């Protein structure tokens, strides 16, 4: 297995940024779309619950409809080659004896994981559906991080979007998928301008060594 050397890693980490405008003429190839989808699918999650569903929007009219319900991101979304809608599962779907969890794992894995997961729901969450919902969103955001970094490895760009009306965007999508519960959006494409210099805390402020 080959790994990026330190120089290439640092360059990639510094070049990745929240792209605020994309090349509207750039169209993803089917290979690129499949690769982005696979990056999303392979994302890690606690107990391997994978409590998400990814909707890849490439249809320009549909992107435009969704963009109309974003806050200050309309032109950026319309310029993107694709828009990934990250949907979260509902807490009821993650109950240990429900259909989703019972059919998610191979039998040999299920007999080991399900009892432990059920115990965690009681000990950590006190069987609170609200806490379980927060847990589900945490897993979705882990996937979002992997997607954005993976897209950078492909030489492409992204922007995570939290500013949108989830109910209105859900209404746009409801004709095509069943009542989506939307965690966030990710605009995807090719940048039209170089990223500005990255601004981050110093190592002293950001990291404590013990």
From Swiss-Prot:
Cross-referenced Pfam families: Nitroreductase
Ranges in a coiled coil: none
Enzyme Commission number(s) of this protein: 1.-.-.-
CDD domains according to UniProt: NfsB-like
Sorted UniProt keywords: NADP, Oxidoreductase
Binding sites annotated in the UniProt record for NADP(+): 150-155
Gene3D superfamilies noted in UniProt: NADH Oxidase
Molecular function (Gene Ontology), one example: oxidoreductase activity
Top-level EC class as recorded in UniProt: oxidoreductase
InterPro entries per record: NfsB-like (IPR033878), Nitroreductase (IPR029479), Nitroreductase-like (IPR000415)
Function noted in UniProt: Reduction of a variety of nitroaromatic compounds using NADPH as source of reducing equivalents; two electrons are transferred.
Family listed: Belongs to the nitroreductase family.
Protein's recorded name: Oxygen-insensitive NADPH nitroreductase
Lineage: Bacteria, Pseudomonadati, Campylobacterota, Epsilonproteobacteria, Campylobacterales
